[in-house]
From Swiss-Prot:
InterPro entries: NS7B_bCoV. This is ORF7b protein. It is found in: Host Golgi apparatus membrane; Host endosome membrane. Keywords: Host endosome, Host Golgi apparatus, Host membrane, Membrane, Transmembrane, Transmembrane helix. GO terms for molecular function: identical protein binding. It holds the Pfam family bCoV_NS7B.
């Protein structure tokens, strides 16, 4: 039971980290897209 709960906690933690990284990448890509659009519009 203890090993299973530790494995479940580890998997949940990994999933949470992957989710955070995915959100960071999306925000980073979105900010880059906004910068590109602003540059093209002003130019």
């Amino acid at each position: 039971m203890i090993e299973l709960s530790l494995i479940d906690f580890y998997l949940c933690f990994l999933a949470f980290l992957l989710f955070l990284v995915l959100i960071m990448l999306i925000i980073f890509w979105f900010s880059l897209e906004l910068q590109d659009h602003n540059e093209t519009c002003h130019a």
